[in-house]
Curated annotation (Swiss-Prot):
Active site residues per record: 68, 133 (proton acceptor)
One Pfam family in the UniProt entry: Peptidase_M20
Protein name: Succinyl-diaminopimelate desuccinylase
Catalytic activity: N-succinyl-(2S,6S)-2,6-diaminopimelate + H2O = (2S,6S)-2,6-diaminopimelate + succinate
Cytoplasm keyword on record: no
Domain of life from the UniProt record: Bacteria
Residue ranges crossing the lipid bilayer per the database entry: none
GO molecular function terms noted in the UniProt entry: acetylornithine deacetylase activity; cobalt ion binding; succinyl-diaminopimelate desuccinylase activity; zinc ion binding
Cofactor: Zn(2+); Co(2+)
Family listed: Belongs to the peptidase M20A family. DapE subfamily.
Function field: Catalyzes the hydrolysis of N-succinyl-L,L-diaminopimelic acid (SDAP), forming succinate and LL-2,6-diaminopimelate (DAP), an intermediate involved in the bacterial biosynthesis of lysine and meso-diaminopimelic acid, an essential component of bacterial cell walls.
Subunit structure, interactors included: Homodimer.
GO biological process entries: diaminopimelate biosynthetic process; L-arginine biosynthetic process; lysine biosynthetic process via diaminopimelate
Length: 375
């Protein structure tokens, strides 16, 4: 069994459902310290974070990831227990197999091979690992980034081990992500008997034309890196639970996934303008979980693309699609951030898995990326 596969199985066996780490990071420290990494545990409100660094010079290449996993869902629906790593028909099954314990194992073993083969390499190598990526993400990577910024540690490159590949290992690198902004809109009416609408004001009827306009609005055209900004309603809550009562208010939850062609302020102003145009009495609360970030084609993306091509023969595509990730926090302190990892078709699903044939090539791609940047 390869060292990367063995470490992946070790990590899967630790049931680190967010925000628990369950000893994953302690195991990583055991492997990193003998290589010369100075390891620091940073805890915040029940979340365990690891910052490890070898070297004190630039450039600093950081590998980032998360040891927490999403809940398993119904155990009886799993073909094998989610925290008992199991190989069947060329696949390794277990919660975290794809998202993202294989990536973490591959990064650590790649660093071990690189350091042992090139003890006099230039620059520094870092690891930023958290147990709060799948949860609120308020006490994880963002806490470490703030600490690093406060003490003046400069990151030059960061590779986040998110499962970015689509069909085969290496077909997709994420070189950016869209921002995410949510709104909770409460439209106020006047409750009353449904037989006497003249004595009430139905907020559902009132907001319908405004919602139709928001749905039809073209927010921007996107750009060469991003799809156009999208606006989606996720929930509508209204009614008193009876069929003969006009509700007093309706609550609408919506979300923007926005690109660099739009701004937070600009989108908010346009939403308010549409609501005001329709004469609604409303309250709107905004929350921003991440701003868009982008690493244009350059040193880091080229180094990783070359590593993928050399290892697999695959020509990779740069993409900014998908949800948010911890890359949004790291991009605030690091000029070049990309995400790369195994295929994502089974992530967060029952019987999550990775094809065993991809595990060592993933490790080799991470090692080749180090060679391209630090030799």
């Amino acid at each position: 069994m390869s060292k990367t596969l063995a470490l992946t199985e070790e990590l899967i066996a630790l049931s680190s459902v967010t925000p628990e780490d369950k000893g994953c990071q302690s195991r990583l420290i055991e492997l990193l310290e003998p290589l010369g990494f100075v390891c620091e545990t940073i805890e915040s409100d029940g979340v365990t974070n690891l910052w490890a660094r070898k070297g004190t010079t630039q450039p600093l290449l950081v590998f980032a990831g998360h040891t927490d996993v999403v809940p398993t869902g119904p155990l009886e629906q799993w073909t094998s227990p989610p925290f008992v790593p199991t190989q069947r028909e060329g696949k390794l099954y277990g919660r975290g197999a794809a998202d993202m314990k294989t990536s973490i194992a591959a990064m650590v073993v790649a660093a071990e091979e690189f350091v042992q083969a090139h003890p006099a390499h230039k620059g520094s190598i870092g690891f930023l690992i958290t147990s709060d990526e799948e949860g609120p993400a308020t006490d994880g990577t963002v806490i470490v980034c703030n600490a690093l910024k406060a003490r003046g540690e400069q990151l030059d490159y960061c590779v986040v081990g998110e499962p970015t590949s689509s069909d085969v290992l290496g077909d997709t690198i994420k070189n950016g992500r869209r921002g995410s902004m949510s709104g909770k809109l409460t439209v106020k009416g006047i409750q009353g008997h449904i037989a006497y609408p003249q004595l009430a004001r139905n907020p559902i009827h009132q907001c319908a034309p405004a919602l139709a306009e928001l749905v039809a609005e073209k927010w921007d055209d996107g750009n060469e890196y991003y799809l156009p900004t999208s606006w989606q309603v996720s929930n509508i809550h209204g009614g008193a639970g009876a069929s003969n009562v006009i509700p007093g208010n309706v609550v609408i939850d919506f979300n923007f996934r926005f690109c660099t062609a739009s701004t937070v302020d600009g989108l908010q102003k346009r939403v308010h303008a549409i609501l005001d145009k329709h004469g609604l009495e409303y309250d709107l609360k905004w929350s921003i979980s991440g701003h868009p970030f982008l690493t244009p084609k350059g040193t880091l993306s080229d180094a990783m693309s070359d590593a993928i091509k050399s290892e697999t023969g695959v020509t990779t595509e740069l993409s900014t699609t998908g949800g948010t990730s911890d890359g949004r926090f790291i991009a605030q302190i690091c000029p070049q951030v990309v995400e790369f990892g195994p295929p994502n078709g089974s992530i967060h699903k029952i019987d999550e898995h990775i094809e065993v044939r991809f595990i060592d090539p993933l490790k080799n791609i991470y090692r080749r990326t180090m060679e391209n940047l630090l030799l």
